[in-house]
Amino acid sequence: KRCYRTPDLKSQTCPPGEDLCYTKKWCADWCTSRGKVIELGCVATCPKVKPYEQITCCSTDNCNPHPKMKP
């Protein structure tokens, strides 16, 4: 499995057993000026969403590009 990973936003091979890609977004102190923090990576199971987070998981290679990378 290959997923985009932060902080370098490069596609990387996931560790064994981590077969899902994820995108996690949340607001930090600077949310109003810079927007949400975005974290990308690999996981074995989709994490539980906390009230202040948005999490999207997907199962195809490189299915989690940073929003600014999309055409």
UniProtKB/Swiss-Prot annotation:
Top-level taxonomy: Eukaryota, Metazoa, Chordata, Craniata, Vertebrata
The keyword Metal-binding is assigned to this record: no
Organism field: Naja melanoleuca
Any Gene Ontology CC annotation: extracellular region
Family the UniProt entry places it in: Belongs to the three-finger toxin family. Long-chain subfamily. Type II alpha-neurotoxin sub-subfamily.
Subcellular location: Secreted
Molecular function GO labels: acetylcholine receptor inhibitor activity; ion channel regulator activity; toxin activity
Tissue expression notes: Expressed by the venom gland.
Database matches in CDD domains: TFP_snake_toxin
Name of the protein: Long neurotoxin 1
SUPFAM superfamilies: Snake toxin-like (SSF57302)
Function summary: Binds with high affinity to muscular (alpha-1/CHRNA1) and neuronal (alpha-7/CHRNA7) nicotinic acetylcholine receptor (nAChR) and inhibits acetylcholine from binding to the receptor, thereby impairing neuromuscular and neuronal transmission.
Alphabetic keyword roster: Acetylcholine receptor inhibiting toxin, Disulfide bond, Ion channel impairing toxin, Neurotoxin, Postsynaptic neurotoxin, Secreted, Toxin
Disulfide-bond pairs as recorded: C3-C21, C14-C42, C27-C31, C46-C57, C58-C63
